[in-house]
Amino acid sequence: MKNSNSITITPDIVRQHGLTLEEFGRIGDLLGREPNFTELGIFSVMWSEHCSYKSSRYYLKKLPTTGPRVLQGPGENAGVVDIGDGVAAVFKIESHNHPSFIEPRQGAATGVGGILRDIFTMGARPIALMNSLRFGAPDHSRTRFLVNGVVDGISNYGNCTGVPTVGGEIYFDPCYNGNILVNVFCLGLIPSDKIFLGKASGVGNPVIYFGSKTGRDGIHGASMASSEFDESSEEKRPTVQVGDPFAEKLLIEACLELMKEDWVVGIQDMGAAGLTCSTFEMAGRAGTGIDLELSKVPMREAGMTPYETLLSESQERMLVVVSKGMEQNALALFDKWDLDAAVVGEVTDTPMVRIFDNGNPVVNLPVELVVDGALDLKRPTKKPEYLKEVNHVDLGLISEPARGEEILKKLLSSPNIANKHWVYEQFDHMVRLNTLGLPGSDAAVIRVKGSQKALALSVDCNSRYCYLDPFHGAQIAVAECVRNIACSGGDPIGLTNCLNFGNPENPEIMWQFEQAVSGMGEACTFFDIPVVSGNVSLYNETSGEAIYPTPTVAVVGLLEDRSFHTTQWFKEDGDLVALIGLTMEEFGGSEYWKIMCDRVEGKPPHLDLRLAQSVNKLCLELIQKKFIASAHDCSEGGLAVALAESCISHPIAPKGATLSIDSTVRNDAFLFGESQSRILISFSAKNKLAVEAKAKAMDVPFAVIGKVGGDSLVVDINGKEFIREEVSHLKELWFGALETYVG
């Protein structure tokens, strides 16, 4: 290989590598010498925000991460939660925002590939994917291109690897015009006593590279993901990785076969920072060192330097440590699966990673300095000035409407509320036959083979709420995920998060981050949900324009009996419809307010955590006692949209409903406001007394408001008709709107 270590390191070169001159000076002081060019590249990626979490670690320590079910919390490739019967759920959510904006198809595809590897690296077979996507305004010049590229990338990679994409969310807002968000979640199952960790243990044990060959794609991907965009962002296209889902499928099967052996010591995928990160992190977790010989690495391109080889983020690559003497067994297994593989190093008893190229030393660095040496930056925080302007709603902007049909139709046609079938029909959501029900209900539900159990999955964040109040906005994200799980018949058992924010060097952005993490931590503690894994994505801004704070959360819930699985749509004519929870006069951050006066203002809806918990517990108990037929949470678009969706989302036969509501707040607030902790349920009239008695016994606000039947949605408020619309027309609007924007 060519060697680039003769390059003289100047202040400009240091800054181009994303390090400050102070950080570079500290590296020299701790090393006792100036790093060479290849070593500079290693510090560049390992001390980047993407890998080191240097701006966020201080705050992340405040999240609850332990619990009786937690088998592995943050710090490994994914979190692991016990679900009983010797089985554990392995899950995580990750971002691939910057690459997906530059090259949407490959950026999104490799985001899927990376999160799959995080799961099967732990020894689990991936069984479900979800995604949380954010795009700019629907009429923005790049939105259609970006949406189509991202959806195609996700669907192609997931479909080819045979892992179903079972749910997710997609939102549009001008704040994402310059930075889209692509957050991907994956769930796997594993025997609870067969968890594999990313540790390079056992002095003298061989280190084996396997998977695809190494090329120049993705070099400095981690550093690129740790800086903001500007007008030259298109020039960063070469830093986007290129994925091969068929190679990933081979990798999955090879790894799961490998892990049946008792001589696998530790294993990790090569994700951000590639071979560099996997080598240093595996040594760091084990308290060992590694000697690595780069000439043994399978290469796709000739003439690559050690710098390029170490920083390449070519996809579908893994590093495994096996027991000494088992090298040939491992290599034979990889050959069977047609994967490139080679012994590239061994574990040492030094605290160093030493890297050679044809025997010539090119890197000699202390593991601890590289892995943990980046200082925790408790950056300054400042409450944003914009909040003084936006935290007020002038109710005089919109007079109380006399009729609600046109408003409801506008809401159902909004790309943020419209049915997402155009997206999920491109995904194979039934492969492996574990998915219970079609996408589109409150949570996806996946059966656990070999038992009666199932897992419910939900991902959520309302970034407008977080823009207006990041503390309560993050709490609402947690609460809605938990509510979605309850509506589907599950108990929440674990959470993973993806914290998407702007430039942390801006004190106002750090204030948003601090508030969001604090709010999330308080909500998780209250609901007794451990945060077992996650990801932080900073610098999501272009030319100084930051995205709204978007702390996305995904919650996994457990159904002890999959017969508890409940969906959102009305089932039978004559069933009664009831509302659980309280409605207040709240418009802040709502889709209604945005559509009617094109403003994002006010404060998020009030969230009473105790009421939220009571509402969830009542809903879950009614489901488990088989008292109710449907359950649907009220979120974007409020009660009116929840009612409409309950009427029209039935996959075969939409049903009408007639409602009569007594209200002490404005009509539009009751129907289109987004008061929290409300669930719409339907049930047979024969269960009315039992349902009412349970609500009264648990002291939860509850009211029967109508009945299922007919071919129209009819809503009377205080004795006056407010909405009358045929459900067939509502379904046509709701079902076809998204495709008109992005199809």
Regions found by a protein language model. Give the residues of each.
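Glycine/proline-enriched, intrinsically flexible loops and inter-domain linkers
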Residues: M1-G743
